[in-house]
Amino acid sequence: MGVLCFGASNILLCAEDSSSVLGLGGFGGGGGEVAAELGCGGGGGFDFFGFGGGAVFPIDSDEFVALLVEKEMDHQPQRGYLEKLELGGLECSWRKDAIDWICKVHSYYNFGPLSLYLAVNYLDRFLSSFNLPHDESWMQQLLSVSCLSLATKMEETVVPLPMDLQVFDAEYVFEARHIKRMELIVMKTLKWRLQAVTPFSFIGYFLDKFNEGKPPSYTLASWCSDLTVGTLKDSRFLSFRPSEIAAAVVLAVLAENQFLVFNSALGESEIPVNKEMVMRCYELMVEKALVKKIRNSNASSSVPHSPITVLDAACFSFRSDDTTLGSSQSNSNNKDYNSQDSAPASKRRRLNTTPI
């Protein structure tokens, strides 16, 4: 492919931390002290993927998690969005096509699981807030590229050039300036809240609570990551808060590995989430057989899979064989394109005029 950008020289590379989610920064330096008192980030966590920058499950204090729960809905789609998706309108088709494409590119570059989750989060929040044009088919592809580009800039240490993200059935080829303009539109629509609260913000906390403070194994952390990204495609999971999804994920994984009984553990716990919604989320996971898919996937191979394995088969053929789950390193030496999967740029439509 093309040249990869190392370092932070690329435009719009973001440097937010968890304190920025709660607005704890930017107050004469005092924000960092407040965040430290609350147990915000940097206070330890489970790093199973060896990289950090989205690969760590932080163990935050009860007070800080309570603040995250209070703020998490600020990073969710607008009200009424799920109903629009259920009606099968334009938002539904855009979402499906965009997630399918994002999954393929995410797996191709072997990005981390949080990058995938953030890209879909940006997509959903944008679609819920923006009036979509019916006669601008190119915009759906440009939006997909921009959301994934922003997510990788937030979480990855090796960030491909925007042009290099445009692979796998890309009908149009957008110039970097068009992608950057769309990124600005997305960020403005999202009110510049890119360091979103996601289920990954809570998984370390719930693992610590439900696993009696014992560090979980690589397998448990891997399953939690897989199950979390496995909820992305089904829009019904949008009815749950990130904290509720995280609690359901951790309990489901621990129950599957016979560390606890789901119902009793949930009932006896003192966690700052709606237990009824956690149970409903778990029941939807069972209905979708997500845990079963993860178990079968892990049983079929001794090599840890990418989190993408719990998504549909359309993504499977593009999965990396890297032994590190959620690795953010791009195996640039192994990027030989399959002519059936990625058409040459010369055969795809290039927008010479400014689309936005």
Swiss-Prot record:
Keywords: Cell cycle, Cell division, Cyclin. Residues 325-343 have a biased composition (Polar residues). One of its GO terms (molecular function) is cyclin-dependent protein serine/threonine kinase regulator activity. The keyword Cell division applies. GO terms for cellular component: cyclin-dependent protein kinase holoenzyme complex; cytoplasm; nucleus. Residues 346-356 have a biased composition (Basic residues). One of its GO terms (biological process) is G1/S transition of mitotic cell cycle. Pfam families: Cyclin_C (PF02984), Cyclin_N (PF00134). Residues 325-356 are annotated as: Disordered. CDD domains: CYCLIN_AtCycD-like_rpt1 (cd20543), CYCLIN_AtCycD-like_rpt2 (cd20544). Gene3D superfamilies: Cyclin-like. Belongs to the cyclin family. Cyclin D subfamily. This is Cyclin-D2-2. It comes from Oryza sativa subsp. japonica (Rice). The gene is CYCD2-2.
